[in-house]
Design a protein with these regions (language model features):
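Secreted/processed peptides and extracellular or luminal domains of membrane proteins
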Residues: 102, 125-128
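Short Cys/His-rich metal-coordination motifs, predominantly Zn2+-binding knuckles/fingers
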Residues: 99, 122-123
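A sequence/structural signal for flexible, mid-protein segments enriched
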Residues: 118, 125, 159-161
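Short cysteine/histidine-rich metal-coordination sites, predominantly Zn2+-binding motifs
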Residues: 111-122, 133-146
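N-terminal pre-ligand scaffold of iron-sulfur
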Residues: 2-110, 144-162
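Short, solvent-exposed loop/turn and secondary-structure capping segments
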Residues: 107-108, 130-132
C-alpha cells in the first residue's frame, strides 16, 4: 500500500520569531537549505546542515501550546519545485520512520550532506530533494511529512501542525 503524503502522526510546533534564528530563517527562505529543530528542556536547538547552531528560548505561549513531535523536525525549502512550479517550505519528523515503525526505536537522523539525512542505526539515507524517499540502504518508508501552516516573512511565525 502506498504511503500517504502526510504522516498520520500528530505533530505541533509554534516558533517565533523565526528571523531571530538564522539557520531556521535561511532554511525557510532559501531553496535547498534545511535545518533540524530539537526540543531541549528550556529551549529549542536549531542546527543547519553545515553544523551552525542557534537556540530559541521556549516562551510561555509555546509551552502552553504543547509542542508535539517524535524526535524533532527537519524544516527547509526543497530546491525541486512542486507541480505548480512553486518552492514551498516543508517539514519532516527527525525520527527514522523505518526504525520507529518496525522497531519502536526513536533514532534521530543526522545530516549526511545538505540534502540527505542518514539514520546511524539502519544506515538508510533519505532525500530531502525528493519528498523524503529512501535513496540508499534497504528500501522502506519515506520520511514522516507534516504540514507547515501560516509561515511568511511578515508573520515571522512558523507553525507545524498535523
Amino acid at each position: 500500500m502506498p504511503q500517504s503524503e502526510y504522516a498520520k502522526v500528530h505533530a505541533f510546533l509554534r516558533l517565533s520569531p523565526v528571523s531571530a534564528v538564522p539557520p531556521l530563517f535561511q532554511a525557510l527562505n532559501s531553496p535547498g537549505l534545511f535545518c533540524t529543530i530539537s526540543r531541549e528542556p528550556s529551549h529549542y536547538l536549531i542546527r543547519s546542515a553545515d553544523g551552525k547552531e542557534a537556540t530559541l528560548s521556549v516562551t510561555a505561549l509555546e509551552a502552553y501550546n504543547r509542542p508535539e513531535m517524535i524526535a524533532g523536525f527537519i524544516v527547509g525549502t526543497s530546491d525541486t519545485p512542486d507541480l505548480n512550479g512553486t518552492l514551498l517550505p516543508v517539514a519532516y519528523d527527525l525520527v527514522c520512520p523505518n526504525c520507529y515503525t518496525k522497531e519502536d526505536i526513536e533514532r534521530k537522523l543526522v545530516f549526511q550532506d545538505r540534502l540527505t539525512m542518514l539514520c546511524p542505526r539502519c544506515n538508510r539515507s533519505y532525500s530531502l530533494r525528493n519528498g523524503g524517499i529512501v535513496v540508499a540502504g534497504e528500501a522502506g518508508l519515506k520520511l514522516f511529512k507534516y504540514r507547515i501552516q501560516g509561515y511568511s516573512r511578515a508573520s515571522d511565525v512558523l507553525i507545524i501542525n498535523n
